[in-house]
Amino acid sequence: MEVRGHADFAELGKDPVCAGASVLAMTAAQCVKSMEEAGRLRKKAHIVIRGGRVLVTAKPREEAFDEARLLFWTAETGMRLLSEAYPGHIKVKKEE
């Protein structure tokens, strides 16, 4: 999952669309980190949080696959809801 850029709904630091997207991305990152700490990933998670960009990748163990899928699906669903509520400010692209 990658979230980057600015929604340009309001000025930087006062943008509720960016705040919503940031909360979703940071929550996904924290959940993946928690999965890693619990030994539920096959290898170390890749989490980058820097300058308007959040990148989260994880390779779950077989028994944690559904948990990871639900985590990313939830974040994606939240992003899609933001995209519908604020068209033109959030783009959601899904890559397999």
Regions found by a protein language model. Name each.
Residues 1-16, 26, 30-96:
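N-terminal intrinsically disordered, cationic/polar leader segments
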Residues 17-21:
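Short, conserved glycine- and acidic-residue-centered signature motifs
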